[in-house]
Structure formats: C-alpha cells, structure tokens
Amino acid sequence: MKKSQELMTRAKRVIPGGVNSPVRAFNAVGGCPRFIKSASGAYIQDVEGNSYIDYIGSWGPMILGHSNPKILQAVSKVMIKGLSFGAATELEVEMAELITRLVPSVEMVRMVNSGTEAVMSALRLARGYTKREKVIKFAGCYHGHSDSMLVKAGSGALVNGVPDSAGVTIGVAKDTLVAEYNDIDSVNLLFEQNKNEIAAVILEPVAANMGVVLPKDGFLEKVRQLCSQNGALLIFDEVITGFRLAAGGAQEYFGVTADLVTYGKIIGGGMPVGAYGGRREIMECISPIGPVYQAGTLSGNPLAMAAGITMLTELSENPQIYEHINRLGTKLGDGLRKITSNTVNSVGSLISMFMTENEVIDIRSAMASDTGEYSRLFNHLLNKGIYIAPAQFEAMFISNAHTDEDIEKTLSAIEESLNEMRKK
C-alpha cells in the first residue's frame, strides 16, 4: 500500500483529514484508505493495481455497474457541446418528464446538485407550504449535512433537537424533533406535544445509514396517517431507495405515497445531482412562481441529465435488472445467514450484516453491534479482494454487473474471514 500511503500523506497536508468525505478516511476500521484509480462493472482497482469486488458502488448510484458503456456514451456525446450553460436545456425537461412518469406521486420535480441540497430545499418548501416551522426526523436516519438535519435524539424522542455537529446553532436545531424509527408512539407523542406546529415528517423509508433497517409492517402507513390527520407533509428521503427498490422507489415497493420525495446521486448514474418533487400544488410554491426561494447555477446541468436519462431509461425498460439484483441480494443475504449467527438485514439489493445476534430495528439496537469485530472483518475482506463499507453502519449495494460467481466468492471470503477471526 506504499502508493496509497504516500497519497494519504500528501492529502493530509492540503485536505482536512486527507479526504473530502469522512467515511473515506477509514477511521472506523483502521488502516490506510485505498486510493481508487478506475472501476468497471462490479470491480474497482486501486493505485497499486489491486482489484476488488465492490459493494459500495459510490454509495448506491452504480446500480448498472461502474463505467456502464451506455452512460459513458451519453455523457461523452453531450459534453462536447458544452459542460454548463447557466440556462434551460431540453435535457432537463426530458429528465423531469421521465421522473414524473416513473413516480406517479411526483407531479412536478426540481433538479438540484446533491441529496443534501434536495433535502434542504424540500424542508424549506414544506415549511413554506404549511406555514409551520417544526420538522420530525428519526434517530439514525441520515438526510445529508444541512444544519437542521444534523441533530441527535438527546434523551430520546421527548426533547427538541440537539446539535450533532460543531457549528450548528441551537436556534437552527430547536425546530427539529427526533422520533424513534419503527416506534409510531414516539411520532404520535411529538404530534400531540406540538399541535399545529409540525410542517413535515422526513424519513428514509428503509433506513440505510444506521445499517439497513427495514420498517416494521404498518409503520410507514401509520406515519402517513398521522401526517394526514395533523396537516403535516410526509417526505420520503429516497436518496438510497429511489429507483433501487423498484422503478418507482420505496413508494411503489411499500405502496405508501409521500407528499414530497428527495433523490440524490442515483438519478445521475454517479454524476453530482439531486432532485425533489411531489404534488403540483406543493411544488408550485417554489420560485419563480411561488414564495419559496431555491436556485442553483449547475442545477439540471447537461452532463448529469444525460447520464440520468440514460440510466433511468435502462431501469424502466428492463425489469430483468431488478429481478437480477434482487435475486443476488437474496442469495447474499441467505448465504450470510447460513454462515453466521450475526443479524443480517436485507431488502432487494440492499444488505447489512450487523456484528450482533440481536434483532436490529432502530438506532439503539444497531449501536449494540461490535464495531471492533466489524473492523477486523473489513480488513480481512479487503485483503481477500472484497470491498465493503469502511463502517459498520452503512449498506452493501449490489449492481446489475455483479454475478453469481461474485456472490459466491464473497460468501466464501466472509466465511474464511470469520473462521480466521475466531482463531485469534
């Protein structure tokens, strides 16, 4: 790892912590981060020339696999005409039409540049539309790094938000209320304690940032009901689940309709992009036709739109892609359950193995995981050519480029690693 170590040393001189996103630093697992040089299909290659079966996929958007030829061709064709115009383009209209066709609840959509920006804008819109200020989020659900979402539960769901990062003011955090995922009573209590004050409830329909945690049967439906009864908007953060669980995302998969939905990198095949959309009457509150301001120079840029149109078209016209990734997800999940007593949560092509034998249904049960054991497993697998998330509380992503052989190699490597760990 000499070259990666040299690059990390150089990076630390000019980039805080040597990385541009904290998880890349390997702080949770130890060792030197791998600097990636290239990727193709289900594999990534580091600067030393080592190849790994990749289960990160740029944290989700590489659902077709790395360096998909159709996406690369679409981007190449567009970029020779110009990278950004700061003006409207035909491609952004086509992209919006495609999203609204695939997701029936999204009657209008606004393009932005990241999932964080989509969430930030959707929350502002919800507050502007309802003329209320408070928002309910769930402990363990991650919605990007905008100030109002960087809060934790404190002493539980009964208190106002407490800043979870230096630089976030109490004033910003106080209007963010925190409930417990899969605990509908905690949501109901917050509505009772804040009557006519809650603008929206935002959640990941499948939590994927405390590891993969599925909603209990009826949980999403009950949250939907509480929002409707109390005049609050329901916002699904589908940065992870959108166009992955199904062409219509979690709304299609679970049969629960949100008022607003946010998307991130997956709608651009890995290009920097995001979007938020929903009912027409809500979306028409956005400037330039409404009082809620939101703007972006690079929003709807042609490269991201070309990549997104190509990828979403591939997904919508080829249902066998979902059949393939879901079958492999089942194969990996079932295989893990056979070789370990650790808890394995999975849905479709999203999987997490928690280093605990206890059921994981929320952030508290997820935190019971032995992160030291996960760190050991991660490094064993890395040495065997398997690249999983460098943190316990993240998901594994399967792409259409993964094969049965990849899954079998991965299961064999995990079984070998667990056996090696037991001997030490």
Curated annotation (Swiss-Prot):
Gene that encodes the chain: hemL
One cellular component term from this protein's GO annotations in UniProt: cytoplasm
The keyword Isomerase is assigned to this record: yes
Name the UniProt record assigns to this protein: Glutamate-1-semialdehyde 2,1-aminomutase
Annotated family: Belongs to the class-III pyridoxal-phosphate-dependent aminotransferase family. HemL subfamily.
Keyword terms, alphabetized: Cytoplasm, Isomerase, Porphyrin biosynthesis, Pyridoxal phosphate
Subcellular location: Cytoplasm
Catalytic activity line of the entry: (S)-4-amino-5-oxopentanoate = 5-aminolevulinate
GO terms for biological process, alphabetical: protoporphyrinogen IX biosynthetic process
UniProt xrefs under Gene3D superfamilies: Aspartate Aminotransferase, domain 1 (3.90.1150.10), Type I PLP-dependent aspartate aminotransferase-like (Major domain) (3.40.640.10)
Pathway membership: Porphyrin-containing compound metabolism; protoporphyrin-IX biosynthesis; 5-aminolevulinate from L-glutamyl-tRNA(Glu): step 2/2
Modification type N6-(pyridoxal phosphate)lysine: residues: K265
One Pfam family per UniProt: Aminotran_3
Organism: Alkaliphilus oremlandii (strain OhILAs)
Subunit field text: Homodimer.
